[in-house]
Amino acid sequence: MSAPTLSPNEFCILKLLWSANHALTRPEILEALPEQDWNPNSIHLILNNMIKKGVVEVEGVARCGRGYGRTYAPTISRTEYAAAQTMDTTSDMSGGERLLGVFAALVDMQGIDEKTTAELEQMLEQKRKELDAQ
């Protein structure tokens, strides 16, 4: 999966949708990001571009003032987006080389605790079983 290139405004909205944990209407987005000073027409264009890029979808409709408005939800998780960005950045490396390199860098930067180590071992064991079954 290739990570779509997002404008700063698109990424700002995507981060808001990730943190909201539910679909938001255009007025809710505007209200949650008052520092952006967007007008309603601008945000409509931004959301339509995000739909075209496949990072946002219209999930439904909700009451907005006297009428109804579409609700927008992300189609990609924060983790999936970060992984796709990383894969694009390291596209000159083989798959295994990328994974090991990124993992080693993250461990060096962030450190790793016993719980995380156990979860990683469990994930690797599950992957081994899947590969053995093939």
Regions found by a protein language model. Name each.
Residues 23-32:
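Short acidic, hydrophobic short linear motifs in intrinsically disordered regions
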Residues 5-9, 61-83:
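Short, cationic-aromatic polyanion-contact patches
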Residues 1-16, 20, 77, 92-96, ...:
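Short alpha-helical segments that sit at the start of domains
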Residues 31-40:
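Short helix-coil junctions and helix-kink-helix linkers
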Residues 13, 50, 120:
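Conserved RecA-like P-loop NTPase ATPase core
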Residues 54:
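Glycine-centered, phosphate/nucleic-acid-interacting loop/turn motifs that mediate DNA/RNA or nucleotide
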Residues 82-129:
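Amphipathic alpha-helical dimerization/coiled-coil segments
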Residues 44-51:
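Short, hydrophobic-biased segments on the C-terminal half of alpha helices
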